[in-house]
Amino acid sequence: RRRGIPGLGGWFTSREEAGGGPMLDVGVHFLDLSMWLTGFPEPLTASATSHRVFGHRKDYTYLGMWGTTPKPGGPFTVEDLLCGFVRFKGGISLRLEAAWACNSAPSAVVDILGDKGGLHLLPELEFYGQKGGNLIDVKPHLKKISGYVAELEHFLDCIRRRRKPMATGEQGVKVQRIIDALYKSAKLGKEVKV
């Protein structure tokens, strides 16, 4: 987000109550998606920096915020930007940023870069690779579906047919271990083991 700290000055911007800022609010979803797309590799180390620049400023100007009415002077003990890097077994690495407020164009990007090709996922799926001696760019035409509806249908299918859910508790724990390591690294100012 460019400028849009949710619930500024309330519980949502209190580390003691919310646990963290944009990494826990929006970054977790991109981390989880990246992990899912790469088969949930085993994380080894994490390195991060976090910044608290805008939320406490009296002259903070924003584009829009949801949640409660902003309370200037209220608690702001979370980051408004976290930049991280995670190393995984098998030579996989992940770079991520999560922001509520920064001086940049708003963006939501997920790129997977591999030796045989690359995927750009947002806002539309694109594949980049090589076929024979030619570089190829492919934009597949996919049926548009509602992610929320698909999630609910999968959830109901798991209950009705006693199937294992695509997203498991173990995967959630792995994602949370990475987030905890990113926050620890930012606090200590060095790379840490996950």
Task: Locate predicted features.
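Predominantly a Rossmann-like dinucleotide-binding segment in NAD(P)-dependent oxidoreductases
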Residues: 1-75, 189
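Active-site rim elements
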Residues: 19-22, 71-72, 139-143, 161-169
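Residue-level signal for the nucleotide or nucleotide-sugar donor/cofactor binding architecture
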Residues: 25, 150, 167
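A general structural signal for well-ordered alpha-helical segments in protein cores
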Residues: 30-31, 149-153, 179-180
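Conserved glycosyltransferase catalytic-site signature
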Residues: 31, 78-82, 176
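Phosphate/oxyanion-binding loops and surfaces in catalytic or ligand/nucleic-acid-binding neighborhoods
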Residues: 37-41, 118-122, 182-185
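NAD(P)-dinucleotide binding in Rossmann-like oxidoreductases
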Residues: 57, 71-151
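C-terminal helix-rich "cap/oligomerization" subdomain common to oxidoreductases
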Residues: 89, 133, 155-194
